[in-house]
């Protein structure tokens, strides 16, 4: 299933190039239940996307792209790429998305020089490892210059029925992790997976930071955590730990740009 509010040229359509572009203010809103066949994809492309319903695409993928130009290549290693930003680009994921044994890829870019929240995740996103061994991946991606993403709710790339845990990435210039976050890449029988947080700067603090020490502690109970700062533009790529963190299992890896 492919839904887009952006345009495609006749030449791209005839040649099979899924290159969508335009400045349409139209948005995609899903409040219902969408179920793809096993191995299928559900793709939404628009300047603004809101999901409060349910989307399922096991062994396939759910791809959400918000921008003014988005390129889709289901046969390539990068399935969806937001090439150009859109004014007021935003993806609101407050519903349920599941792609067990597959991919959930959410990417948005906002135009302008002011910081803007482009992804607000408050729902449940799952890409768990299947009993047959295929693991899942979850990506929440904003631009590394000005974009912000707010990450709450549940991100689940665990392996409850065997196999290794999956991979989760939350990446943007600014990444804010809310206190209600529940993230797991836990494997009951195999190797636990990893959650990567990739901002420009990152502060762990009891208040006023990007993530509390309590949220870090809780997240480490569900899997490995990597915080890797980029240091683009005016930001320095620093990591500040100003709150207590305790854990007895899994790995916390901090990699600062400077």
Give the ranges of each region predicted by the language model.
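Extracellular and secretory-pathway beta-repeat/beta-biased strand scaffolds
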Residues: 1-258
């Amino acid at each position: 299933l492919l839904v887009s509010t952006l345009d495609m040229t006749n030449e791209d359509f005839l040649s099979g190039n899924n290159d969508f572009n335009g400045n349409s203010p139209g948005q995609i809103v899903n409040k219902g239940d969408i179920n793809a066949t096993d191995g299928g994809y559900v793709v939404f492309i628009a300047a603004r996307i809101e999901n409060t319903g349910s989307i399922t695409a096991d062994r396939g993928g759910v791809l959400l792209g918000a921008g003014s130009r988005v390129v889709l290549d289901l046969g390539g290693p990068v399935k969806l790429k937001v090439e150009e930003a859109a004014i007021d680009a935003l993806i609101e994921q407050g519903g349920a998305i599941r792609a067990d044994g597959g991919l959930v890829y959410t990417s948005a870019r906002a135009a302008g020089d002011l910081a803007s929240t482009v992804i607000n995740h408050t729902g449940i996103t799952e890409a768990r490892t299947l009993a047959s061994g295929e693991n899942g991946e979850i990506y929440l991606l904003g631009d590394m210059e000005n974009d912000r993403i707010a990450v709450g709710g549940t991100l689940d790339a665990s392996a409850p029925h065997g196999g290794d845990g999956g991979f989760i990435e939350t990446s943007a210039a600014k990444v804010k992790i809310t206190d209600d976050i529940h993230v797991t890449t836990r494997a009951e029988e195999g190797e636990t997976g990893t959650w990567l947080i990739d901002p420009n700067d990152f502060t762990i603090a009891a208040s006023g930071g990007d993530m509390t020490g309590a949220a870090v502690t809780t997240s480490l109970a569900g899997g490995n955590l990597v915080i890797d700062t980029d240091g683009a533009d005016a930001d320095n790529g620093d990591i500040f730990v100003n709150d207590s963190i305790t854990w007895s299992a899994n790995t916390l890896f901090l990699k600062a740009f400077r």
